């Protein structure tokens, strides 16, 4: 089993698809990495040899931030937004949608579960 950037890639999949299991790598970046490393996209992960794995690791380090480095950078960017007090930072702090989505209805993913509000009892005379 090929282990790249701390992730075990699925053995039966093609390498171009297997690389997308790493956080921060999509289809286009996967193809770019394989092109730079000089590896055919149609080869399966189980058929990779050690030199090909090493070439992928080396190219990956040169090309992009992935996994832990990328996650920590994203968290630092969000923390910076919250610290400077900009609109996006306030939305992150309050746990609301950041990119202009509506919040009167929907936005349940960001806001959490539904909070029911009890009705006031009518006063009888």
From Swiss-Prot:
Q: Does the keyword Chloroplast apply?
A: no
Q: Does the keyword Transport apply?
A: no
Q: Identify the stretch(es) annotated as Disordered.
A: 95-125
One matching Pfam family is: Ribosomal_S13
Could you list this entry's UniProt keywords, alphabetically sorted. Ribonucleoprotein, Ribosomal protein, RNA-binding, rRNA-binding, tRNA-binding
User: InterPro entries, from UniProt?
Assistant: Rbsml_uS13_C, Ribosomal_uS13, Ribosomal_uS13-like_H2TH, Ribosomal_uS13_bac-type, Ribosomal_uS13_CS
Q: Name one GO biological process term.
A: translation
Per the record, the domain of life is: Bacteria
Basic residues: compositionally biased ranges:
105-125
Family the UniProt entry places it in: Belongs to the universal ribosomal protein uS13 family.
Assembly, in brief, is: Part of the 30S ribosomal subunit. Forms a loose heterodimer with protein S19. Forms two bridges to the 50S subunit in the 70S ribosome.
**Could you tell me what this protein does?**
Located at the top of the head of the 30S subunit, it contacts several helices of the 16S rRNA. In the 70S ribosome it contacts the 23S rRNA (bridge B1a) and protein L5 of the 50S subunit (bridge B1b), connecting the 2 subunits; these bridges are implicated in subunit movement. Contacts the tRNAs in the A and P-sites.
Descriptive protein name: Small ribosomal subunit protein uS13
Native organism is Leptospira interrogans serogroup Icterohaemorrhagiae serovar Lai (strain 56601)
Report which gene this protein is encoded by.
rpsM
